[in-house]
C-alpha cells in the first residue's frame, strides 16, 4: 500500500477541476480554454512527478497501489495501481490530452461544456489504465464513453449524429459482453467472489468457461481496438468528429482496446489466449492488408487516415498473438508510437480543413506553395506513419517481426506466410499515404481559385506539431526509453505460457 494516494488524485483531479469550470463567470471562451490547458499541464506534471519519484523500473509488481473499501454491501473496493504495462499509456494520455486541448482553441460554441467533457474523458481514460479491480475498470471504461458520445454528437460534421449513434451502439453493445465477463469471472471459483486483478491472475478455470470469458472480453476489446469486422464505426466517427476529438480517439481510445487485450485476455486467461492466438494472428494479418487496400479508395481525408489506424492496429494484434518477448514488447511500443502518429496526422488534417473547408481529397491540390510549414510537417509525419527508419513506427514494426520469427508456437511455413503478407501490407502503406500527400499538396487546383485565403501555421500549430514529432523521433532513435518500462512486466505475463 502506498502512503500517499497519488493515483486517486491523478484520476479524480481532471473531472473535479472540470466541474468547477461550469461555475466560472461567462467572460468569453478564452478563460475556459486557458483554465483547461492549465489543468491538463498541472495534471501531466503531477503524473510525471509521481511516477519519477515512486516508480521502480525493475519491479514487475504493482506499484503506487491503493486499496480502499468503497461499498460494503457489494464488497467493492477502490483499487488503484500501476505497472510497466500501464505507465506508458497513462503518460501518453496526459501528453495527447494536453495537446488536444491546445488544438481545440478554434472551438467557440459551448466552449465550457466542450472542455469539461475533455477533462471528464481524461479522468475516465487514466482510471481505466490504473484500475486494479475489474468492476472499477468497467465503470471507468463506461465513464469515458459518455463524454466521447457528446463530443461526437455536438461538435463535428453534417453527419455527426449518425456517426455518434453508430459509435455508441457499437461500444455500448460491446460493453454488455464486458460486464458479463467481469461478473462471470469474479463470481466463479473461490468461495468468496473477488474482483481483485492480482488474485484473478492466479485463478484457473475449466477450459469451456475460460473460452467463453475470453470471447466476451475479446468482443468488447475488438470493438474498441478496432479489430475487423467490428471496425466500421471508426471511419465514420473520425470522418465527422472535430479534429481535437479525433486526436483523443486515435491517440488514446483505440489503445484502450489493445491494453484490455493484454491486461485481461492475455494475463488472466492464458490457456484460452494460447488457443485463440493463431486465429488472432490471421485476423491481424488480414487487417493490415484489408485496411491498406481500402484506404486509397476513401475520398474523405480523415477516413483515409482512420483506415491507416486500422492497419497499424493489425501489428499490435500480431504482436500480442505471437506470445513472445519481442512480439509483446513490439505491440506495447506500437501502442505508444501510433498514439503519437495518429494524433499528429488528425491534427494536421484538421488544420488543413480550417483553411480550405474541404474534406474530399479530389477537391484539394496545390496547397504546398501556400502553406509550406503544414506541408513539411504533414510529409514528415506521413513518413513516420509508413515506418521510416529513425521514427518510432519503424522500430515497433521491426520488433513485432522479430517476435513472429522467434515464436515457438507457429510452424516455419506459417511464419514465412505471415511475414510475407505483412510485408505486402507495408508496401501498400506508402501507396495510400504518399498519394494522399500528392492529392493534398501537389498539383494546381486551389492556387487559382478565388475566395481562398491561405495562411500558414501559426506559433500554436507549429508548437503542437513539433511537440508530437519530438517523441516520435526520440523513440525511433532510443526505443529503450519505452521498452525498459514494460520489459519486466512482459516477462511476468509470458511466464504463464509454456513457450515464448
Curated annotation (Swiss-Prot):
Keywords: Chloroplast, Membrane, NAD, NADP, Plastid, Plastoquinone, Quinone, Thylakoid, Translocase, Transmembrane, Transmembrane helix
TM stretches of this protein: 4-24, 35-55, 87-107, 113-130, 134-154, 167-187, 211-231, 242-262, 272-292, 305-325, 330-350, 386-406, 416-436, 462-482
Superkingdom as given in the UniProt entry: Eukaryota
EC numbers for this chain: 7.1.1.-
Primary location class: plastid
Swiss-Prot/TrEMBL catalytic activity: a plastoquinone + NADH + (n+1) H(+)(in) = a plastoquinol + NAD(+) + n H(+)(out); a plastoquinone + NADPH + (n+1) H(+)(in) = a plastoquinol + NADP(+) + n H(+)(out)
Membrane protein topology class: Multi-pass membrane protein
EC category: translocase
GO CC aspect terms: chloroplast thylakoid membrane
GO terms for biological process, alphabetical: ATP synthesis coupled electron transport; electron transport coupled proton transport
GO molecular function: NADH dehydrogenase (ubiquinone) activity; ubiquinone binding
Subcellular location: Plastid, Chloroplast thylakoid membrane
Record-stated family: Belongs to the complex I subunit 4 family.
Protein name in UniProt: NAD(P)H-quinone oxidoreductase chain 4, chloroplastic
Species lineage: Eukaryota, Viridiplantae, Streptophyta, Embryophyta, Tracheophyta
